[in-house]
């Protein structure tokens, strides 16, 4: 089967654009670290250009790297729907679903698609190769490795289904560095000297995070029939069993018993590499029924980055009730907009939210209900927490910090 491997190049980000956000000293530090790497080629490979945090990061990171003299490129592998069904199974298994079984047919399809894609991208010609997530991880098997290869894992790998992990591990171990969001995601069999801990980031200048005028926010709310005069609870996430969407609906219903006017916004993108998302999307609609105070807002009806931005800014409370979460970029986005987030105490969320200071960490839906009611009844506390949340993002989770960490890794590999 022939695949059309696509190369993506978007935006014209420049490091200087971020000076007002990160300060001149930080800009100079990054420029200094980039000096030895100027003219070097650095290629990223993943499985989708749209939907999900990896694609969002790359849309900003690739042009930003180019602005400091690094020849950054980004390729997206292709495959049939069956391949993405298999890799979604991988995703679920690696995040801890023990009921899933790895068949010989799944292995064969996974390897065949990686092999076919390897014929259309000459990755051996780059100075540094960075492969994102399990989908293209086996690419390393099909090249003569002439330069450092890095594997970036964006999922919660703290307790994987062992059968799937053992299969994937044989490829991961061939990489020169493996990058994880948190130390607990590094499996014990891996060489700790090769492991790097690095949280992902957001781009404050992207359509999803840039400042919006209040008039634009109100126009967007009106377009999607959201009442700005009534309290708004929002969760932004894929339609995925791991995102805890049914818990969010339950939280909203219990809050509504106390505050009848409350509205719930379920905001999400239907991503191209997530066939399972369509099934869960339909289940979500059935769960909601005919409650017109719940809005399901997706790219299918014209919700794109700027609209998501407006919904987050208009919200009184942001939830992230994921059951597993490698690192919740939507949590960081909301925090950057000065919103305290109520999140389940799992994965990267535990690291993002400082409990009681920049938001609340909860164990279950009942705890979340208490915290939602508290924030709705104490807007001054909410505002204070939101200000601290924004500052935490500025110091730790901005795209320029992300890029700086990559520069450190490349320099350590002999840049």
From Swiss-Prot:
Asked if Membrane is a keyword of the record, the answer is no
Please tell me the species this chain comes from: Pyrococcus horikoshii (strain ATCC 700860 / DSM 12428 / JCM 9974 / NBRC 100139 / OT-3)
Please state the Enzyme Commission number of this protein: 2.4.1.245
Q: What is this protein called?
A: Trehalose synthase
Q: Partners and quaternary state?
A: Homodimer.
Q: Which InterPro entries match?
A: Glyco_trans_1 (IPR001296), Trehalose_Metab_GTase (IPR052078), Trehalose_synthase_GT (IPR053462), TreT_GT1 (IPR049438)
Q: What does this protein do?
A: Synthesizes trehalose from ADP-, UDP- or GDP-glucose and glucose.
Show the GO MF annotations: trehalose synthase activity
Q: Name one GO biological process term.
A: glucose metabolic process
- The domain of life for this entry's organism is Archaea
């Amino acid at each position: 089967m022939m695949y059309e491997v696509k190369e993506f190049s978007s935006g014209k980000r420049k490091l200087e654009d971020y000076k007002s956000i990160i300060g001149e000293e930080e800009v100079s530090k990054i420029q200094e670290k980039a000096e030895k790497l100027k003219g070097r080629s650095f290629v990223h490979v993943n499985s989708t250009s749209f939907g999900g945090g990896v694609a969002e990061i790359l849309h900003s990171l690739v042009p930003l790297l180019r602005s400091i003299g690094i020849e950054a490129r980004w390729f997206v592998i292709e495959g049939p729907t069956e391949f993405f069904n298999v890799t979604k199974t991988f995703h679920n298994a690696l995040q801890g679903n023990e009921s899933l079984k790895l068949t010989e047919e799944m292995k064969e399809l996974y390897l065949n698609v990686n092999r076919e894609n390897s014929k259309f991208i000459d990755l051996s010609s780059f100075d540094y190769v960075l492969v994102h997530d399990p989908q293209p991880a086996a690419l390393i098997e099909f090249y003569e490795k002439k330069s450092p290869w890095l594997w970036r894992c964006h999922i919660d790998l703290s307790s994987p289904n062992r059968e799937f992990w053992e299969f994937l591990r044989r490829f991961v171990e061939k990489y020169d560095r493996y990058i994880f969001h948190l130390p607990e995601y590094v499996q014990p069999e891996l060489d700790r000297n090769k492991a790097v801990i690095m949280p992902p980031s957001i781009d404050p200048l992207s359509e999803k995070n840039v400042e919006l005028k209040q008039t634009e926010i109100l126009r967007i709310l009106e377009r999607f029939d959201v009442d700005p005069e009534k309290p708004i609870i929002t969760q932004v996430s894929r339609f995925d069993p791991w995102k805890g969407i049914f818990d969010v609906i339950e939280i909203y219903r219990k809050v509504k018993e106390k505050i009848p006017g409350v509205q719930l916004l379920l905001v999400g993108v239907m991503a191209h590499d997530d066939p399972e998302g369509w099934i869960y999307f339909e289940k979500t609609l059935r769960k909601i029924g005919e409650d017109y105070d719940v809005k399901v807002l997706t790219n299918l009806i014209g919700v794109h980055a700027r609209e998501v931005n407006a919904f987050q800014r208009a919200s009184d409370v942001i939830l992230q009730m994921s059951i597993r979460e490698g690192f919740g970029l939507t949590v960081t986005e909301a925090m950057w907009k000065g919103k305290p987030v109520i999140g389940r105490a799992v994965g990267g969320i535990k690291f993002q939210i400082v409990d009681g200071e920049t938001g609340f960490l909860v164990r279950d839906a009942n705890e979340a209900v208490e915290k939602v009611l508290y924030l709705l009844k104490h807007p001054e506390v909410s505002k204070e927490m939101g200000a601290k949340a924004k500052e935490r993002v500025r110091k730790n989770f901005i795209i320029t910090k992300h890029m700086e960490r990559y520069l450190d890794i490349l320099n350590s590999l002999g840049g």
